[in-house]
Amino acid sequence: MSEQEVTYTTLRFHKSSGLQNPVRPEETQRPRDVGHRECSVPWKFIVIVLGILCFLLLLTVAVLVIHIFRDGQEKHEQEKTLNNLRQEYQVMKNDSSLMEEMLRNKSSECKALNDSLHYLNREQNRCLRKTKIVLDCSQNKGKQVEGYWFCCGMKCYYFIMDDKKWNGCKQICQDYNLTLLKTNDEDELKFLKSQLQRNTYWISLTHHKSKEESQQIGDRPSKLDSAARNSVPNRQKCAYLSSFSTEEDDCARTHGCICEKRLNKFPIPGSCAKGRTQSALQRDEDES
């Protein structure tokens, strides 16, 4: 019996040990898989969150870079515009200075011209107040000649109101020991134009169409409008003075006359001065 018990015990030991402690690979690996699964889920969530944060950070950096670049461009454009405005302002300032300088110069010139004009007006009025006299003369033939004369400076001008041909004006000036007006002085012509009491007066200038040249008594050329020379074809032309210009006309037509003489020999035709004696006029000559 002892041998059976030993054998039984041995079998029972081996059997009980095999039944009570069954070892399975799945059971030994299950706790590890659960622990691994429990640990992997939080790390995935953290990675996703970190990725989103990195994306947002990169997006923010990109937006900031774009804004900084755009602000830099706008600042550069503003500085460029500001420099252009400064240059334009400087140019306008220089132009304004030049305009002010020109205005001052023009004002000075205008003032000088006004002073000269006032002086000439005073001198002109002084001359006219001293010497202007209306004459009513009669020639030896009994024909009455109306006119007036005045002196200014060293010249006296005798205006004959009767209409005569150019040769007639030349002759009547010679009868009074005068000469038909001959001048090339623009200032003198302007002065005489301002004193005209009628439209036109002959002066000492003739022009022949065939020769296309001007001839003036005293061998002095005169400036005339070339268009006026063509107004009367193939006829001798003579110059006349109007209140507007110096022009030419047919010498056979009639205009008034302007005679002249210098003060060293006063132009008194006999004793035909109306309201004045020859001695009184001579005293005027001496005083002038």
Swiss-Prot record:
Cellular component annotations (GO), alphabetically ordered: plasma membrane
InterPro entries documented for this protein: C-type_lectin-like (IPR001304), C-type_lectin-like/link_sf (IPR016186), CTDL_fold (IPR016187), Ly49_N (IPR013600), Mouse_KLRs (IPR052013), NKR-like_CTLD (IPR033992)
Gene Ontology process terms (BP): cell adhesion
Membrane topology qualifier: Single-pass type II membrane protein
Gene Ontology MF annotations: carbohydrate binding
Keyword field: Cell adhesion, Disulfide bond, Glycoprotein, Lectin, Membrane, Receptor, Signal-anchor, Transmembrane, Transmembrane helix
Glycosylation sites recorded in the entry for this protein: N94, N105, N114, N177
Primary localization class, coarse: membrane
Transmembrane segments: 46-66
Disulfide bonding pattern of the chain: C151-C156, C169-C257, C173-C259, C238-C251
Extracellular side: 67-288
Sequence ranges assigned to domain C-type lectin in this UniProt record: 144-263
Domain of life: Eukaryota
Membrane in keyword set: yes
Compartment(s): Membrane
Ranges per topology, Cytoplasmic: 1-45
The protein's role, per its UniProt record: Receptor on natural killer (NK) cells for class I MHC.
Assembly mode: Homodimer; disulfide-linked.
Protein's name according to its UniProt entry: Killer cell lectin-like receptor 2
UniProt source species: Mus musculus
